[in-house]
UniProtKB/Swiss-Prot annotation:
This is Serine/threonine-protein kinase LMTK1. Expressed in brain. The gene is AATK. Residues 125-395 form the Protein kinase domain. The keyword Nucleotide-binding applies. InterPro entries: Kinase-like_dom_sf, LMTK1_c, Prot_kinase_dom, Protein_kinase_ATP_BS, Ser-Thr/Tyr_kinase_cat_dom, Tyr_kinase_AS. Pfam families: PK_Tyr_Ser-Thr.
Length: 1374
């Protein structure tokens, strides 16, 4: 029915037939429906009409009661209503009536609310009294009657005689106060300008100006506002300025005298024009009658011309300066700024010279330092100053959180709030050029890409911030962990028991309390610790970064540790990983890579060496020197005497090991002496020759000695972030510290009166040689000294000392003069021998000739391995780092080390292209097992698959050049050991290196190699390791079974033991990977090192062959009890089986468990280079299965400062640790734990290349000779220059730093440096370098990577083709 009701046809037709005739019968229901519908409609119509009428009548009634005054009140109230506020914005506020006991309290409020310009007219004003006079005329206190109430106001009256200009000025001054309505801005209630005199009616503030109020309170201390009130007032002033700026107004005279205070102590910016009269002393009146608020005005607004003071218009940044002074004035209760200085002094010192700054207010405030920090922000340069909004945000936060938030939490949030991204200062914040610390911010060029990650609630801790800075040298990744502290070295990672044991092992007695461990390479840090993972675009050579099993066992490293030289080099290389510190004298090594404070703060090295005696010494020493090192302070002692060889000891007998503080002291002394003597990295530096004495010309240094970076490079032991080559080597730190100091190695050099050579290993050889004894003792001594100095430092491999051999190292002879150039700081009495040794060491470094690199498998696996890798790199990669050409072989060694990645970075094909030297590569005979991968730094930053980590095929035999340099005609009577230096390209497995630290190390190595290679020409008396430079970069020089390990010198000491061993050999006991030639038996006789052309500076990386105990060398490395002495020289199994006196750093006696794996493992690791190398790098040293007679060697980290030792121990876990612990570490292998401010610089392998900029322009001009194929590098001409291999050209491209591996062809693991001590031994051809894939950086805070930053540089692309391109070309100059 309902439907029918609404059907018109039915409704109207239902009662009619189709014709319209009415139906006789009507349905009753239908009728009712029709009626109901009708009534409903009628009712609806009536309701609508009534509604309309009611509405109309209501409106009419409202109008009837409307009147003008009421309308205004309504309008006024409407403006304050929420709806209106929403429409008009926040500029208009209805101020609540303040409930104050004072009778006048409500008056101002009501006047603000109710008085309108229409209400206020001349007729409604009642003058009460005159309160002052201004430039315009009189100021009166008046009262306005608005009908229902009255309110007090201030009336400014313009004098009737005012000119039109004055009239305009009078009205303009009040414009902001009329247009803006804000609780912290004085309001102008009305202006009466219809007739003269002009009147301005201002809001009345009963307490007057803020300055007068505070001064009165200061007199009556009981009335002084409490600090919280003052802080609130400061926020209100900032809020008022912010509102002005948002509306494009600036205050021309911001100061407390121009801020007024209401009855409820609310601050309002504004004035009545009485300041000039009341505070005459606050103004400097010029001859032109300009009133200048000199003590508040920003310096850029004032200028002086012909004794006339000129003032420009105020700016927003100028207001911020004045705001800072106003806040200072507030906290000083109205004290005039610079109260002790006259206006002229303020003008001279504050305005003109900008030297005088206001001191911190004496008022005791919560977070007073932060308040003062904000003030200082306001006084930065105009472009660096925070905005008013930033200042207000900071002050508001300080007020709100200062009293309630825990200090630690506050600090974290504070950094995130600071203008400019918060934090250059906090590694994380790094952003604000203005606020990161006046200096930090000013100099900051960081881009806080990850600022959002520091936002509230992103991290529970919020302590970590990663700042990525794009620099000419590459990307700087600054990551700071604030939550952790040195006290909790392994909080999340280790169980209490393990932690205690670890510290006991790693931080022997006397070790600094703090430990900064590089726990494991694999697992992300547990808990709140973070690790940085460098991911490779494509896996390189199937390298599995996480494959711990692939990495050579730490024990192998131990054996390598025996090789002092290698170890030393490795430790230098590791040093950057452990904490590159710019060299002490670093101009170039800026602490950027590793903040010194970080080291200083971090007694990181508690886990210094497995050996309690040696470990504490090396690490403990590092603590003191860490400051010098910055983070690089691995083992300052190591750097001082990384090889354990001390310039101090010249006698055949090794110096007694120093223990504890004694060792530290001696290390310090040696270091000082060494610094004086060594400019370039001594054996300690991974860049065996890369360090040049400061005296060297930066360019010449870069070009002359691979191991000797240019002076400016030298200072910066670690390359700039953009300087991958330099920083990679621990050397950089050493160099930076002292022009004449090779960290760790200087001892070696100084020994025997040999001038401390810049070469890394040279000191051991030099010392050995200088000891002049055929006593292996001399070598052991070097090792021992290094140990003593560095504690866990690996002794330099016992290299037949020139004196032992009775013949100077040939290669060094020529560079004796060069040596002075290279080592101006260090006398080179036995320059020939020393230089030769250095060169040899450099070559060995570059060519992984020194097993010591591997040696660092003992002690901390991470530290040892990293150190080992570093040393390996130092000996091999160190040279590599210094000489990309040497890198391949060293890479093998590097892989052994936890740091090897950095060494891998050092792997810079410098070995391949180094000065024409072919790298001695055990892989020449066979692939170095763990080299490719073992080099992983253990930092997750490194991705082995990353192109950076891709070993480039050795297309250039840089190392041979280095070796040739080393071998280059030494005048020494001792037979030259000829090392076939052609280095085979690193296996693709080897191409990996840690981009983060290793790239730094590598850069350092590269930079070092460049300069040092130049030095290679010098020959040192005594046997030289001649590294025939094979033209073929792919060639690898292998140590002859009989030859390698010993210099074939007359004395066993001459043996260049594992020194030649490839990095490939993992931290395994044997330095040389199986691919390497078997360890040479005791020297069969003086081996002639083929002299190679050497630049003016000689590479001073001397690897001291450590006579195998089995061989019964007269002496073993003597060192601290912890040092691995006799056993340290371990046979390298890599060769045919002839035991080779391993070059090793004497470390504190480590248990056999520390021994590195046998070379076999190295080979195995070569097979799984990536994994093995990584394992070697990260795994705690385990007794190597293959280490038969090899005593576990603890890698010696060569550091300029003793604090470096700490880093070393952290990087390498002592093999003493239980297998369980080692396993745990391996499980966490990829975790890098920092418990202090840590700056991590991640560089793409290629990114540090010249494209990123030339850290050392001079170096660029003169690329390392090895790169150039300088005469110092015999093989330079023969083998492709590394630079050529690298798209960027020579390693020197990086401003004297070596190009990254990507720049150089990556060497295959097989290309691990093998040294053929036998001159006749041909060097195997190095595999053609494989293009390095682009690498990308993934920063992983926590197991899951929060963000991934991919940085692909042109050099990366170049590097891909670089290995191939570089195969035959000479190194290019950056």
């Amino acid at each position: 029915m309902s439907s029918s009701f609404f059907n018109p046809s039915f409704a109207f037709s239902s009662h009619f037939d189709p014709d319209g005739a009415p139906l006789s019968e009507l349905s009753w229901p239908s009728s009712l429906a029709v009626v109901a519908v009708s009534f409903s409609g009628l009712f609806a119509v009536i309701v609508l009409m009534l509604a309309c009428l009611c509405c109309k009548k209501g409106g009419i009634g409202f109008k009837e009661f409307e009147n003008a005054e009421g309308d205004e009140y309504a309008a006024d109230l409407a403006q304050g209503s929420p709806a209106t506020a929403a429409q008009n914005g926040p500029d208009v506020y209805v101020l609540p009536l303040t409930e104050v006991s004072l009778p006048m309290a409500k008056q101002p409020g009501r006047s603000v609310q109710l008085l309108k310009s229409t209400d206020v007219g001349r007729h409604s004003l009642l003058y009460l009294k005159e309160i002052g006079r201004g430039w315009f005329g009189k100021v009166f206190l008046g009262e306005v009657n608005s009908g229902i109430s009255s309110a007090q106001v201030v009336v400014k009256e313009l004098q009737a005689s005012a000119s039109v200009q004055e009239q305009m000025q009078f009205l303009e001054e009040v414009q902001p106060y009329r247009a803006l309505k804000h609780s912290n801005l004085l309001q102008c209630l009305a202006q009466c300008a219809e007739v003269t005199p002009y009147l301005l009616v201002m809001e009345f503030c009963p307490l007057g100006d803020l300055k007068g109020y505070l001064r009165s309170c200061r007199v009556a201390e009981s009335m002084a506002p409490d600090p919280r009130t003052l802080q609130r007032m400061a926020c209100e002033v900032a809020c008022g300025v912010l509102h002005l700026h948002r509306n494009n107004f600036v205050h021309s005279d911001l100061a407390l005298r121009n801020c007024l205070l209401t009855a409820d102590l609310t601050v309002k910016i504004g004035d009545y024009g009485l300041a000039h009269c009341k505070y005459r002393e606050d103004y400097f009146v010029t001859a032109d009658q300009l009133w200048v608020p000199l003590r508040w005005i920003a310096p850029e607004l004032v200028d002086e011309v012909h004794s006339n003071l000129l003032v420009v218009d105020q700016t927003k940044s100028g207001n911020v300066w004045s705001l800072g002074v106003t806040i200072w004035e507030l906290f000083e209760l109205g004290t005039q700024p610079y109260p002790q200085h006259s206006d002229q002094q303020v003008l001279a010192y504050t305005v003109r010279e900008q030297q005088l700054k206001l001191p911190k207010p004496q008022l005791q405030l919560t977070l007073s330092d932060r308040w003062y920090e904000v003030m200082q922000f306001c006084w930065l340069q105009p472009e660096q100053r925070p905005t008013a909004e930033e200042v207000h945000l900071l002050l508001s936060y300080l007020c709100a959180k200062g009293a309630t938030e825990a200090e630690e939490e506050f600090e974290r949030r504070w950094r995130s709030l600071r203008p400019g991204g918060g934090g250059v200062g906090p590694g994380p914040g790094a952003a604000g050029p203005m606020l990161g610390g006046v200096v930090e911010l000013a100099a900051a060029s960081s881009f806080p890409l990850l600022e959002q990650f520091a936002g509230d609630g992103f991290h529970a801790d919020g302590d970590d911030v990663l700042t990525v800075t794009e620099t000419s040298r590459g990307l700087n990744f600054e990551y700071k962990w604030e939550a952790g502290r040195g006290a909790e070295a392994f909080p999340a990672t280790l169980s209490p028991g393990r932690t205690a044991r670890l510290q006991e092992l790693c931080a022997p007695d006397g070790a600094p309390p703090g430990v900064v461990p590089v726990l494991s390479a694999h697992s992300p840090s547990l808990g709140s610790e973070y690790f940085i993972r460098l991911e490779e675009a494509a896996p390189a050579a199937g390298h599995d970064p996480d494959c711990a099993g692939c990495a050579p066992s730490p024990p192998a490293t131990a054996d390598q540790d025996d090789d002092s030289d290698g170890s030393t080099a490795a430790s230098l290389a590791m040093e950057p990983l452990l904490g590159h510190g710019p060299p002490v004298d670093v101009p170039w090594g800026r602490g950027d890579h590793y903040p010194r404070r970080s080291l200083a703060r971090d007694p990181l090295c508690p886990s210094r060496s497995p050996s309690p005696s040696a470990g504490p010494l090396s690490l403990a020493e590092g603590g003191a020197e860490d400051a010098d090192w910055g983070v690089a302070a691995f083992c300052p002692a190591f750097f001082e005497d990384p090889l354990g060889t001390s310039p101090l000891g010249s006698s055949g007998a090794p110096p007694l090991p120093l223990t504890g503080e004694d060792e530290l002291e001696e290390v310090g002394a040696r270091r000082a002496a060494q610094r004086g003597h060594w400019r370039s990295n001594v054996s300690a530096n991974n860049n065996s020759g890369s360090r040049c004495p400061e005296s060297w010309d930066p360019v010449s240094a870069g070009g002359h000695a691979e191991g000797c970076p240019s002076p400016k490079q030298t200072p910066r032991a670690s390359p700039e972030p953009g300087y991958p080559g330099e920083p990679l080597l621990g050397l950089q730190a050493a160099s930076a510290q002292e022009p004449g100091c090779c960290p760790g190695l200087p001892h070696l050099c100084s020994a025997q009166g040999l001038a401390p050579a810049p070469c890394l290993v040279t000191p051991s050889w030099t010392e050995t040689a200088s000891s002049g004894g055929d006593h292996p003792q001399a070598e052991p001594k070097l090792a021992t000294e290094a140990e003593g100095t560095t504690g866990p430092r690996l002794p330099l491999p016992s290299v037949p000392s020139p004196s032992q051999e009775g013949a100077p190292l040939p290669s060094e002879e020529a560079s004796a003069p060069d040596a002075p150039d290279a080592l101006p700081d260090s006398p080179t009495p036995a320059t020939g021998g020393e230089v030769s040794a250095i060169k040899l060491a450099s070559a060995l470094n570059g060519s992984s000739s020194s097993p010591e690199v591997e040696a660092p498998s003992s002690e901390d696996e991470d530290t040892a391995e990293a150190t080992s890798g570093i040393f390996t790199d130092t000996s091999s990669d160190g040279l590599q780092a210094r000489r990309p050409d040497v890198v391949p072989a060293f890479r093998s060694l590097q892989k052994q080390v936890g740091t090897p990645d950095s060494l891998d970075s050092l792997d810079i094909p410098s070995s391949a292209s180094d000065g024409g030297y072919e790298v001695f590569s055990p892989s020449a005979t066979g692939p170095s097992g763990g080299q490719p991968r073992a080099l992983d730094s253990g930092y997750d930053t490194e991705n082995y698959e990353s192109p950076e980590f891709v070993l480039k095929e050795a297309q250039e035999g840089c190392e041979p050049q280095a070796f040739a340099e080393l071998a280059s005609e030494g005048e020494g009577p001792g037979p030259e050991t000829r090392l076939s230096t052609s280095l085979s390209g690193l296996n693709e497995k080897n191409p990996y290196r840690d981009s983060a630290y290793f790239s730094d190390l590598e850069a350092e190595a590269e930079a070092t190699s460049g300069p040092e290679k130049k030095c290679g020409g010098d020959r040192a008396p005594g046997p030289e390791l001649g590294l025939p430079s094979t033209g073929q970069p792919s060639e690898q020089v292998c140590l002859r079974p009989g030859v390698s390990g010993e210099a074939q010198g007359s004395g066993p000491g001459e043996v260049l033991p594992p020194l030649l061993q490839l990095e490939g050999s993992s931290p395994e006991p044997s330095t040389c990977p199986s691919g390497l030639v078997p360890e040479p038996p005791e020297p069969q006789g003086p081996a002639k090192v083929r002299p190679g052309p050497s630049p003016s500076c000689s590479q001073f990386f001397l690897l001291t062959p450590v006579p195998l105990r089995s061989e019964g060398n007269s002496s073993e490395f003597q060192g601290p009890p912890g040092l691995l002495s006799g056993p340290a020289p371990q046979k390298r199994m890599g060769g045919p089986g002839t035991p080779r006196a391993p070059l090793r750093l004497a470390l504190p006696g480590l248990p056999a468990a520390l021994e590195g794996r046998p070379e076999e493992e190295e080979e195995d690791s070569e097979d799984s280079d990536e994994s093995d190398e990584e394992l070697r790098c990260y795994s705690v040293q385990e007794p190597s299965e293959d280490s038969e007679e090899e005593a576990p060697a603890v890698p010696v980290v060569v550091a300029e400062s003793q604090s470096a030792r700490n880093l070393r121990s952290l990087l390498k876990m002592p093999s003493l640790l239980s297998e369980t612990f080692c396993e745990d570490l391996e499980r966490k292998k990829k975790a890098v734990s920092f418990f202090d401010d840590v700056t991590v610089y991640l560089f793409d392998q290629e990114s540090p290349t010249r494209e990123l900029g030339e850290p050392f322009p001079g170096a660029k001009e003169s690329p390392p000779t090895f790169l150039r194929g300088s005469p110092g590098s015999p093989s330079a001409p023969n083998r492709p220059q590394q630079a050529d291999g690298s798209p960027n050209g020579s390693t020197a491209e990086e401003g004297g730093g070596f190009a990254w591996d990507d720049d150089f062809p990556l060497m295959t693991a097989k290309a691990a440096f093998a040294m053929a001590l036998d001159p006749a031994a041909p060097a195997p051809a190095a595999p053609t370098p494989t293009p390095a894939p682009f690498s990308r950086f993934t920063v992983s805070p926590a197991p899951t990577s929060r963000f991934s930053i991919t940085h692909v540089s042109d050099s990366d692309a170049e590097s891909k083709r670089g290995p191939e391109a570089g195969a035959g070309g000479e190194s290019k100059e950056a």
